């Protein structure tokens, strides 16, 4: 069995930010520079995170419905793992 050359760190030492708030909303584009994206639903996600010094920052991004479904599925998997710890 090969040894990893990377140092092994516990989960707490890898945490760089803390999730403070998570909001999402469903939207539909009605006008755009790119007509191909009109009338397609999207999910807007707004995150509030605190870095290791406590400074809070807002982050936002948009995802298609399939991207959001995958994002949600991954969060469910994370939650299931956390429950076993």
Swiss-Prot record:
Keyword field contains Cell division: no
Keyword field: Acetylation, Cytoplasm, Nucleus, Transcription, Transcription regulation, Ubl conjugation pathway
N-acetylmethionine: modified positions: 1
UniProt subcellular location: Nucleus; Cytoplasm
GO molecular function: NF-kappaB binding
Primary location: nucleus
GO CC annotations on file: cytoplasm; nucleus
Subunit architecture: Component of the commander complex consisting of the CCC subcomplex and the retriever subcomplex. Component of the CCC (COMMD/CCDC22/CCDC93) subcomplex consisting of COMMD1, COMMD2, COMMD3, COMMD4, COMMD5, COMMD6, COMMD7, COMMD8, COMMD9, COMMD10, CCDC22 and CCDC93; within the complex forms a heterodimer with COMMD1. May form a homodimer with isoform 1. Interacts with RELA, RELB, NFKB1/p105. Does not interact with NFKBIB. Interacts with CCDC22, CCDC93, SCNN1B, CUL4A.
Function: Scaffold protein in the commander complex that is essential for endosomal recycling of transmembrane cargos; the commander complex is composed of the CCC subcomplex and the retriever subcomplex. May modulate activity of cullin-RING E3 ubiquitin ligase (CRL) complexes. Down-regulates activation of NF-kappa-B. Inhibits TNF-induced NFKB1 activation.
Family: Belongs to the COMM domain-containing protein 6 family.
Full protein name: COMM domain-containing protein 6
Annotated gene: COMMD6
